[in-house]
Each structure stands twice: as C-alpha cells, then as structure tokens.
Amino acid sequence: MSRYVFTSESVTEGHPDKICDQVSDAVLDALLAQDPSSRVACETVVNTGLCMITGEVTSKAQVDFIHLVRNVIKEIGYSGARAGGFDANSCAVLVALDQQSPDIAQGVDEADDHEGDPLDRVGAGDQGIMFGYACNETPELMPLPISLAHRLAKRLAEVRHNGSLEYLLPDGKTQVSVVYENDKPVAIDTILISTQHTAEVAGISDEQGIRERITEDLWTHVVEPATADLALKPSREATKYLVNPTGKFVVGGPQGDAGLTGRKIIVDTYGGYARHGGGAFSGKDPTKVDRSAAYAARYVAKCLVASGLAERAEVQLSYAIGVAKPVSILVESFGTGKVSNAELTELVQEHFDLRPGAIIETFGLRNLPQQRGGRFYQDTAAYGHFGRNDLKAPWEDVAAKSEELVKAEAKRIKQGATV
C-alpha cells in the first residue's frame, strides 16, 4: 500500500500578487466589455503606496484606468483607516500601456496554416505548452488539497467582508495537507492559515492571547463552515491545525511585500497536483493560448473524467506562434483509463477542436465580460480558475461533451466487436 501526504496552498484576494492578478483582469474585462476584439497583455505591480499597470493593449475601448484600479483595490478592502500603507484613495496609480507589437499581431490575425476556414485564420498568440487536469476526488473533479485550500481562503475573505471577525485584514494564505493511500484521499493531515489582523484583537493586545483568540475564531467561523458538506472532514483531535505560526501578522499586503501579476500560477490551477506549462492567465486576452488553451485543456480533461473514461486525466497541448493547429496533443491517465492513453488521445483529436479560434468561439471567451455585466475575468483571478461552480465558467460545463464521448466510445467498442 502506498501512503503519502500531498499539500496545496491558496491565498486570499488581498495577497499582493492576487491584487495584481485582479487589477490586470479588471483591465481586461473593461476593454473586452467595450471592444470584444481587444488585444490585451496587462501586467500589474504593487508596493507600498503604489500600483502600476503596464503592458500592451490594442483596443477601440475608452477606459479610465486610474479610476478602475482604485475601485478594484477598494473592493478588495484596502481603504480607510485600516488600509495599512496601501490605500485605494491615496496610492499612486501609474499607467504605462503601449500597443501590441505588429510582429505578434500579424501572426494572430493571419495564421500561417489557414486554408479558407475562418477558424484557421486565428493563430496562437505565442508558442508554449499548456496542461489541463481533472480527477474524481471532488464533485467538481479537482484535487482535494487545492479544493480545500480555496474553500478556506474564500471563507476567510467572506468573514472579513461580512464583519463576523472585524479584526481581520485583507492579506491571507491557507495551506492544506491531505493523506493519500493508494492514490485516494483518506484524511486531512494539516490545515495552516495565516491571516493579517489588527494590532489589537477583541480587546486583546498581547501576542499569545491574540494568536489563541484568532485560532479559535478561525476554526469556528472558517474551517467548520468551509468543510461542513465534505465526507472527509478535519477534526481538532486528528488534524494538525496551525494559525499564524510566526505569532502575529499585522503588517501585510503591499506594505509588507511587493506584488506582481502571474506569480501565483499554481494557486490558479491545480495546487501542484498536475504539471504546469509556466504561462500565467491574468491580464491576457483569449488569443493568448497561455490562458485560452489552458482552459481548453481543463475542459478536455474534465470531459474524460466526467464521461468515466478515466479516473484521472492530464492533457498537454502545445502551440507555435502564428499557427492555428496545436503542435501536439497528449493524454495521460496514470493507469486509470478504461482505454489506453493513445486511444484517449485519438478520441480527443477526433472530438475537440483545439485551434485558438475554435476555443474562443466554443467558450465565447471574447464576449464573457459583455454578457456578464462588464465583469468576468476579474472573478477568476482569485480562488482558482477551475472547479468554480460560482463562476459558471463555460470550460467547466462538460455535460454535453461528456455524453458525446460516452457514445463515441460505445460506438468504437461495438465496431470493434463486429470486426
């Protein structure tokens, strides 16, 4: 019997790097909402008293970027008396956005391999490799460690926003370690929560007293509600439970650490449980395959698991800049597939159109902000891009395609039996 512990982490929306992801995606939303054909590559950096957005934009949209940035920061919670050196109302906001390089644009606008099909005319915005993953550990077909870490981080933000724990401040991190036996989760080994807080907590000012109070409050208000519906639950007796291990966490956010777009790519995806191609998502329009093809790879992997063709599936896609068709497609089922990896790969090639133009069209990626009231991608930028029922993301809706795969496999088996 194999037994091991696997750990994943998440961060709250107030983490410096996540502030940057949300700002970059808010810029993307604002541009796409007005002009769905906008080309966007927006990077954000934050530090004490400063937020700068930079990158390349080609768009007909007219956006007040300074106002937009301040609103995102304020919504996260950095404003007023408890802003801590990073106040939405007074921080410096610098805008340094240029136009997209014409050398890149020509490859995206006119793919090298087009043959009359309009979808062949949209080339990949860059070369690269992307991975998608799904497994049957949770109802949303995500690995349990990252799923739990996101639940805790999101709940931590909720109790701050709703005032249940008034001493909480925006910055925070969670980490969950899960025990596996024969590749199945059997217990929650460790829960770690680090949360920024005020210097005084519920009238308590000594460090030990503050830590003890926060520890008890977070178990009651965060851990228990976040895990209440799970079959596998943590317990105070069996689960190691750590809160603010350094003792206190008063200085946080951009006052404590600089932040940058794209530095939480493992948090954004599968918590390290599956491979990652290295490309970040936030601030990139759908022609950037770092984002759109990663969404497609997740969709394919989830379809394979939802259809029962595999218990675990990892899908690798690769692209060349300016070329529409993927350079390669590979499926790995880790020995859990009902058919071989080669047969799964062949099934994917037959039933999924993974050209960038087709991915954009299938998921409606350019029009999502417009359809969702001017905001969509900003909400993907915290608490993960995958397994999110609250987002109603099109790459998570696999019911119809999974049924198509079931029928295709049944037909293949029937044809094989009659040969």
UniProtKB/Swiss-Prot annotation:
Renumbered residue ranges of the record's region Flexible loop: 100-110
EC number(s) from the headed UniProt entry: 2.5.1.6
Gene Ontology process terms (BP): one-carbon metabolic process; S-adenosylmethionine biosynthetic process
Involved pathway(s): Amino-acid biosynthesis; S-adenosyl-L-methionine biosynthesis; S-adenosyl-L-methionine from L-methionine: step 1/1
Transmembrane segments: none
A GO CC term attached to the entry: cytoplasm
Annotated binding of Mg(2+), by residue: D17
Protein's name in the database: S-adenosylmethionine synthase
Native organism taxonomy: Bacteria, Bacillati, Cyanobacteriota, Cyanophyceae, Synechococcales
